[in-house]
Structures are given as C-alpha cells and as structure tokens.
Amino acid sequence: VVLFMKGTKMMPQCGFSSRVAGVLNYMGVEFADVNVLADAEIRQGIKDFSDWPTIPQLYVKGEFVGGCDIITEMTLSGELDALFEAKGVTYDKDAAEKIREANAS
C-alpha cells in the first residue's frame, strides 16, 4: 500500500492528504508514503501515470485506487475493507466500523 501525498504520514501538508493518511493510520494499515512536494518529477509523473489530476493518490498492490473523495466514499461504504481483504492487506475491522458509525448520522 503506497500513498502519494503532499507531506508525510506523520506531517501531511494538505487537508486531503491528511484525511487519507488519517484513515489508513486509524485502520492500522501499513503503508509507504511518498512526499510529492519533495520532487516535482514524481509529482507530475504520478499524475501522468494514473491519468488522475490530483494528490493524494492511493495504490494497493500496484493498482491505483483513487484520491481523497473516492477513498472517503469507499471507507464509508465498506468497499475499502473489501479491497483490502481481496488484496490480502491487514487492517483493523473494528476501526473501520467506528469510522462508519461516526459518519452515520
């Protein structure tokens, strides 16, 4: 699991990157972070590679999953859990449920 983001998982530099890193951290997912602010070539290259114009970008087992809005929707719908299970990614199911419960109202 790799998150191309602005900043790092310990110090995100934008709200969208912070939200996705926060979800992954809360769910106990081990992930690598790539700070696109550190290298303009990586920042543009990942946008070209995915044909997606914005950062952050989440990849699971080499597959582009989406940006902040998509990851938020997938978390709330349970699709992210299903993807992690299908790809053999370890995560905390109880934490995922707590996120959904907190956003159910």
Q: What are the language-model segments listed below?
A:
Residues 1, 25, 29, 51, ...:
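Short amphipathic alpha-helices and their capping/turn residues within compact interaction modules
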Residues 1-30:
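Local sequence-structure signature of Cys/Sec-based thiol-disulfide redox active-site neighborhoods
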Residues 1-2, 50-61, 66-69:
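Structural micro-motif
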Residues 16, 38, 42, 51, ...:
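Alpha-helical interaction elements in eukaryotic regulators
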Residues 25-45, 49, 53:
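Thiol-based oxidoreductase modules, predominantly thioredoxin-like and allied folds used
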Residues 60-95:
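Non-catalytic, surface beta->alpha helical segment in thiol-disulfide oxidoreductase systems
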Residues 91-105:
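Mature, matrix/stroma-exposed regions of nuclear-encoded mitochondrial and chloroplast proteins
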